[in-house]
């Protein structure tokens, strides 16, 4: 690859000799510098400003390093076409880092003196990408020192999310080396590219949960059980010196030298052991830089900001809480005199702020309701309780401490009617909370008839109920209280709040309030979410099922779109648009424990992303309602939300705002905006129970929360005003539409919006010198700076990389259109495409350097060449320079071919796509595939689900050897097993959980029988199973016989012992396999679906089978004619009507 010497562009010969040379010196190749200028440059201060400077913000503002990345001013857009174009660029354009994200990568990197930063950015504005932009600047540190960039996240789901963000936020950095743009890439190839990219990412990043980091730094405390009387207490073991004994991890982290530590949702590490671990590593590590991410840096109290900022400040110059806040705690806390000024001084240089929430890319939040007397800004829907609930409420003493009062909250949510504990009393008493629910369960089990009859004759006497037997009963193996008391007709007597919310939810249909997606948030699970789920089930809503055939549609099942139910949906009025019936469904999202962190189960996370957030589901066709707990506060995005319901009170309004932020995020409503509805709104409904005189406990709790929230917002305003990028990000924090709308907000008639913390949206930065010189009070913006005023003292080639990359991208754009350009052409195109407001700062050097990188000359250049260019035919190549022309050169052509052959290209068809991939992407293949892929079986390669059956098998004792039916590994598939199953086996596992973690304990799924066990081992199992050994049997034969015996033992045994484990979603073997358990399972399912408590008569019938030592039986279930009305449900379970009975045979 050699060309004539006189054809080589001089730019290519001139490589970068000194990265710290001034750009103006570099761009002028033959410039002469006078001795006086040399002396002046030698005396220049090439240092960054210190956070201790009072004019720190001004010094940052005028630096070329940062000013180039200021957010440009946006004018008011008046026409829909202008708004649509703006949104298309922001929401649907190709991904690129925002100016704010790039700015931070120039502020925190290995070459700047700044140690750490709190990224106080709003929800959904790109915190993760900002942190990743910083991290990418540390990759050469990873290569140099053999360390890794460490990222701490709350839990496993967040870990996967952050990995996804790395791939998204870095463009083609990790993927371009694995993809060939000249061929069709199918889904399998995309997955392969992604997998390879993640492998590269993992060479630079180490992502772990807070808890894992804590274990690797400090170690878990060793706890002992101490039994005193009937109580068991856990105590932490201590050494002789009084320190806690700890279980130290093998791969312990002692320090993180020469790298970067990122902590996502950093407010979670204050006041706990995880924070202690972070502090220890920061204190002992050398040259460690730290980035904290948080939309709500204060969890509950304003003074938690002190601990968070102190992680970033020098160890010997920490912020003191008592100089800022008064000694009171909770809602009584306030600023001390001089506290604000001291706080400003101590946070200066350590905070970046970006509000985001541009009204053109964020839906508008509309708070519904009224502000009760005594509250300042919280709008709520007040629900006045009826006599029964109010009587119980009056007997509950309101708590006065600063915590969530679970008793009063439980009463506010739901009061269950029950028999009096005084046997002589015939009154109905109210029960609430978990204890109350347990009491009601016992009463239903022991005295259901009396209880229901008494409820009908007292509380519900006005309804004249003829058959009260279904008012309350138990379902799901007697664990769930259900019944008609949850029906809308009676619900208001037991929960006025849930009744009011249900009425409004029912109206979210066409012709009333229009159909749309709903998010319901409750902090309490067992006395909140579980009860409201039952309310929905009893009022025509169904729990979401991935297989639509599993829905049990009844006459009163609600339609997702209109107000007509399933029974009369066939006869819709003409004024309702034609639509197919799909049931209105919901899904509950509560946490599962993962290293003491509440995490969303992966399966539900997938459903939220793929089903609920799908634009085709924008009206709730497939999934209408999400009910979530506090696990939904962070890391989840809900798209196209129409309404949000907050059904219980949290003592921390910041947490409530985080929950609301799940549905109001950057571009989440982009897919449903149109000219008729250009500005989508999200209604936020906060429900509280109320009393006629004074405030209820829920309203009082909101009042306390307001006091804390106001102080937190005052602290946040100080952080906003002192942020390093305050003047640079001003146009991303204050928007022209809001300036006009909320110009004089703060009165009762015109309150300031929640997005601005119920304070005026406009604010000035804290630097007085900056404001005096650059603030324009008439336009409420900071003035532009001319190029001559900019400080170039610390600007170098490394910081110019973003502009160079921009130039490369534009040059690559050009070669998609033509094959040959002059330098003049390229300079003109790149400059013209540069943003107008920054064009003055554009330097020709960026284009020179970009061209230099795109033209490999030496063999070493080719070996390290990554800036591949593609022409209009997607051929990969590079640039060559010949006689003042820059010419596209394909990799597979000689450099001396005439231009005619460069312009003419016949794409070869050989080996561009293999036959297998071609066939798999044809409609014929997909149609053929679907014929053999039943809907209820799901995707052919779907993994078996053992997680959901773990509790079932853990509750049973195990036989000495346990078999497992698992999906065959892809590495072992040979086409001989049509079912795709393989039989595994293992020894019995210990019953106690702690013993299961010891060395040598077999895994839950065991090992493949036919390949991992020798014949001697298998023979001992056969002996244990009373099977005769055949010497001619192969290992495969022996395994088949063992499997058959364990299969029948599992199926027919009645001793509650596990012999064979099967997944819940096996396409052919039902779960549970054990017939005795399956009988109870079917009975419970029928109870749940019919909402009845009727038990069938069960007959056990003996039969014969393969093994003489097994008692073979089957069961018959007999339901009488009272179940005729549930004919459709019974037939689904195989029931047949014989004489007057419905009979289900289970065998």
Curated annotation (Swiss-Prot):
CDD domains: SF2_C
Primary localisation category: virion
Catalytic activity field: ATP + H2O = ADP + phosphate + H(+)
Keyword field: ATP-binding, Helicase, Hydrolase, Nucleotide-binding, Virion
Domain annotation Helicase ATP-binding: ranges: 108-315
Family of the protein in this entry: Belongs to the DEAD box helicase family. DEAH subfamily.
Protein name according to UniProt: Putative ATP-dependent RNA helicase L377
């Amino acid at each position: 690859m050699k060309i004539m010497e006189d054809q080589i562009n001089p730019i290519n010969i001139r490589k970068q000799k000194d990265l710290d040379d001034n750009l103006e010196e570099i761009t002028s190749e033959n410039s002469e510098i006078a001795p006086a200028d040399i002396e002046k440059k030698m005396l220049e201060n090439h240092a960054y400003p210190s956070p201790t400077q009072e004019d720190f913000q001004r010094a940052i503002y005028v630096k070329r390093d940062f000013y180039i990345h200021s957010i440009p001013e946006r004018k008011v857009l008046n026409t829909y076409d202008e708004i649509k174009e703006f949104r298309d660029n922001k929401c649907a354009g190709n991904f690129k880092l925002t100016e704010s994200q790039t700015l931070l990568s120039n502020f925190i990197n290995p070459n700047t003196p700044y140690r750490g930063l709190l990224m106080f950015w709003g929800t959904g504005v790109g915190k993760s990408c900002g942190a990743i932009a910083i991290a990418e600047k540390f990759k050469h540190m990873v290569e140099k020192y053999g360390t890794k960039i460490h990222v701490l996240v709350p839990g496993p789901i967040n870990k996967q999310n952050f990995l996804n963000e790395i791939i998204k936020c870095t463009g083609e950095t990790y993927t371009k080396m694995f993809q060939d743009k000249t061929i069709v890439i199918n889904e399998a190839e995309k997955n392969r590219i992604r997998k390879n990219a993640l492998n590269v990412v993992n060479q630079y990043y180490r992502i772990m949960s807070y808890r894992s980091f804590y274990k690797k730094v400090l170690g878990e405390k060793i706890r002992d059980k101490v039994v005193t009387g009937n109580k068991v207490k856990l105590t932490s073991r201590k050494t002789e010196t009084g320190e806690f004994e700890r279980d130290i991890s093998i791969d312990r982290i002692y320090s993180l030298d020469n790298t970067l530590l990122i902590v996502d949702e950093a407010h979670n590490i204050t006041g706990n052991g995880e924070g202690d671990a972070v502090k220890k590593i920061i204190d002992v590590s050398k040259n460690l830089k730290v980035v904290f991410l948080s939309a709500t840096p204060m969890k509950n109290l304003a003074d938690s900001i002190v601990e968070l900022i102190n992680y970033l400040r020098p160890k010997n110059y920490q912020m003191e809480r008592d100089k800022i806040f008064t000694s009171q705690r909770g809602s009584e806390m306030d600023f001390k005199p001089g506290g604000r000024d001291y706080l400003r001084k101590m946070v200066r240089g350590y905070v970046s702020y970006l509000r985001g929430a541009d009204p053109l890319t964020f839906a508008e939040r509309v708070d519904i309701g009224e502000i009760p007397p005594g509250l300042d800004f919280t709008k709520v829907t007040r629900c006045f309780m009826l006599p029964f609930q109010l009587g119980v409420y009056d007997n509950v003493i309101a708590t006065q401490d600063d915590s969530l009062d679970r008793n009063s909250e439980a009463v506010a949510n739901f009061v269950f009617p029950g028999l009096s504990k005084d046997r002589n009393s015939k009154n109905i008493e109210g029960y609430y909370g978990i204890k109350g629910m347990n009491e009601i369960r016992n009463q239903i089990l022991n005295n259901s008839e009396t209880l229901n009859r008494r409820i009908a004759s007292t509380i519900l006497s006005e309804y004249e109920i003829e058959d009260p037997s279904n008012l309350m009963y138990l379902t799901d193996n007697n664990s769930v209280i259900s019944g008609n008391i949850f029906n809308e007709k009676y619900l208001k007597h037991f929960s006025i709040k849930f009744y009011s919310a249900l009425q409004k939810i029912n109206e979210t249909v066409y012709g009333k309030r229009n159909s749309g997606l709903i998010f319901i948030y409750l902090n309490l699970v067992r006395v909140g979410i579980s009860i409201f789920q039952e309310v929905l089930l009893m009022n025509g809503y169904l729990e979401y099922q991935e297989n639509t055939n599993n829905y049990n549609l009844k006459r009163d099942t609600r339609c997702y779109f209109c107000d007509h139910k399933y029974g009369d949906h066939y006869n819709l009025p003409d004024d309702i648009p034609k639509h197919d019936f799909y049931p209105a469904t919901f899904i509950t999202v509560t946490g599962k424990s993962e290293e003491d962190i509440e995490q969303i189960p992966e399966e539900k996370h997938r459903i939220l992303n793929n089903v609920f957030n799908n634009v085709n589901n924008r009206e709730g066709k497939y999934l209408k309602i999400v009910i979530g707990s506090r696990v939904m506060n962070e890391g989840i995005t809900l798209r196209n939300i129409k309404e949000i319901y907050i059904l219980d009170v949290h003592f921390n309004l910041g947490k409530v705002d985080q929950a609301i932020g799940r549905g109001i995020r950057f571009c989440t409503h982009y897919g449903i905006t149109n000219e008729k509805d250009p500005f989508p709104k999200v209604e936020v409904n906060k429900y509280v129970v109320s009393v006629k005189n004074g405030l209820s406990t829920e309203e009082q709790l909101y009042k306390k929360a307001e006091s804390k929230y106001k102080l937190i917002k005052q602290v946040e305003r100080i952080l906003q005003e002192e942020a390093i990028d305050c003047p640079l990000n001003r146009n991303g924090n204050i928007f022209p539409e809001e300036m006009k709308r909320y110009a004089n907000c703060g009165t009762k008639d015109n309150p300031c919006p929640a997005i601005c913390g119920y304070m005026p949206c406009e604010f000035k930065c804290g630097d007085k010198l900056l404001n005096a010189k650059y603030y324009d009070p008439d336009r409420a913006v900071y003035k532009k700076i001319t190029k001559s005023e900019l400080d170039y003292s610390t600007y170098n080639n490394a910081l110019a990389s973003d502009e160079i990359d921009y130039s490369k991208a534009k040059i690559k754009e050009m070669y998609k259109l033509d094959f040959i350009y002059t330098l003049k052409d390229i300079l003109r195109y790149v400059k013209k495409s540069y943003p107008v407001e920054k064009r003055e700062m554009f330097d020709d050097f960026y284009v020179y350097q970009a061209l230099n990188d795109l033209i490999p000359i030496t063999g070493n250049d080719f070996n390290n060449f990554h800036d591949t260019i593609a022409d209009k035919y997607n051929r990969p190549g590079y640039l060559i320079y010949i006689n003042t022309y820059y010419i596209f050169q394909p990799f597979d052509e000689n450099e001396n071919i005439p231009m005619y052959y460069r312009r003419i290209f016949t794409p070869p068809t050989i080996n561009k796509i293999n036959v297998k991939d071609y066939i798999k992407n044809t409609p014929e293949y997909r149609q053929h595939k679907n014929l053999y892929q039943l809907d209820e079986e799901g995707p052919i390669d779907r993994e078996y689900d053992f997680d959901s059956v773990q509790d079932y098998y853990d509750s049973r004792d195990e036989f000495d050897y346990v078999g497992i039916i698992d999906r065959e590994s892809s590495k072992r598939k040979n086409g001989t097993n049509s079912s795709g199953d393989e039989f595994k086996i293992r020894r019995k596992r210990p019953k106690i959980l702690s013993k299961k973690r010891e060395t040598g304990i077999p895994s839950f799924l065991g090992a493949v029988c036919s390949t991992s066990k020798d014949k001697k081992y298998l023979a001992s199992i056969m002996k244990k199973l009373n099977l005769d050994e055949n010497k001619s049997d192969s290992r495969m034969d022996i395994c088949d016989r063992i499997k058959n015996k364990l299969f029948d033992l599992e199926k027919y045994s009645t001793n509650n012992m596990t012999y064979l484990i099967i997944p819940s979603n096996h396409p052919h073997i039902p779960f549970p396999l054990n017939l005795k358990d399956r009988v109870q399972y079917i009975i419970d399912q029928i109870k749940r679906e019919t909402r009845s408590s009727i038990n069938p008569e069960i007959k056990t019938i003996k039969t014969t089978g393969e093994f003489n030592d097994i008692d073979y039986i089957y069961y018959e279930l007999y339901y009488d004619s009272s179940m005729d009305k549930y004919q459709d449900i019974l037939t689904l379970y195989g029931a047949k009507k014989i004489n007057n009975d419905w009979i289900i045979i289970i065998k």
